[in-house]
């Protein structure tokens, strides 16, 4: 069972490490040192729910419903374009709000709402958890499938907390106008690239 658990850890890490809306949001909250551990926890718990749904049967629903898959794709493209546009606006703005009073006025509930949108409207989350993990998990027996799911959840929890803590630790170097412009420009380009790739895949 440990081999199955390790397989889940490695596969979960491989899918969660690339930059996406979730990672970008956790990183930015870590840099601001604003509810970053709460955000990491909520992202990890959301992933746990999605992983469980995908591995224990939810993948069949998404694979069999072309209408649902199309709705997820269209919503995901729109969200990624909007997320990328916001990052680009920040990258090219004359005055970037760092850890100022205006930034800190964001309420806890607004941050939670943004985190939920970043997670649950991210099409790659469903692709990873429902299609990839669901397909692989279905190959295991019930006991082994639980260990596989636990391994992927371990990777998720470890990564989000490590990212939040590392970003908070590096905040003095990352929370500068120049670095923030570079980070937001890179995030915006990646989000638009993912949106284009997803739109082309959905069109096909």
UniProtKB/Swiss-Prot annotation:
Stretches that traverse the bilayer: 1-21, 37-57, 67-87, 111-131, 154-174, 179-199
Location in the cell: Cell inner membrane
InterPro entries: Arg_export_ArgO_enterobac, LeuE-type, Lys/arg_exporter
Signal peptide coordinates: none
GO MF terms, alphabetically ordered: L-arginine transmembrane transporter activity
Membrane topology: Multi-pass membrane protein
UniProt KW keywords: Amino-acid transport, Cell inner membrane, Cell membrane, Membrane, Transmembrane, Transmembrane helix, Transport
GO cellular component: plasma membrane
Domain of life: Bacteria
Pfam families per the UniProt record, alphabetical: LysE
Record field: catalytic activity: L-arginine(in) = L-arginine(out)
Function as written in the Swiss-Prot or TrEMBL entry: Involved in the export of arginine. Important to control the intracellular level of arginine and the correct balance between arginine and lysine.
Protein family: Belongs to the LysE/ArgO transporter (TC 2.A.75) family.
Annotated protein name in UniProt: Arginine exporter protein ArgO
């Amino acid at each position: 069972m440990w081999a199955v658990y390790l397989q889940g850890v490695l596969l979960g890490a491989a899918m969660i490490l690339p930059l996406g809306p979730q990672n970008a949001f956790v990183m930015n909250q870590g840099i601001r040192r604003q509810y970053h551990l709460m955000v990491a926890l909520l992202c990890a718990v959301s992933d746990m729910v999605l992983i469980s749904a995908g591995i224990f049967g939810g993948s069949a629903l998404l694979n069999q419903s072309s209408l649902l898959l199309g709705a997820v794709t269209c919503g995901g493209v729109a969200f990624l374009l909007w997320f990328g546009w916001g990052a680009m606006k920040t990258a090219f703005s004359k005055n970037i709000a760092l850890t100022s009073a205006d930034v800190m006025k964001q309420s806890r509930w607004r941050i939670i709402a943004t985190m939920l949108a970043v997670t649950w409207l991210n099409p790659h989350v469903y692709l990873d958890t429902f299609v990839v993990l669901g397909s692989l998990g279905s190959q295991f027996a019930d006991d082994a499938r639980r260990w596989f799911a636990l391994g992927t959840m371990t990777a998720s929890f470890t990564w989000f907390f490590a990212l939040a803590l590392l970003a908070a630790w590096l905040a003095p170097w990352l929370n500068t106008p120049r670095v923030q412009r570079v980070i937001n420009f890179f995030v915006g380009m990646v989000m638009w690239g993912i949106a284009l790739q997803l739109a082309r895949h959905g069109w096909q």
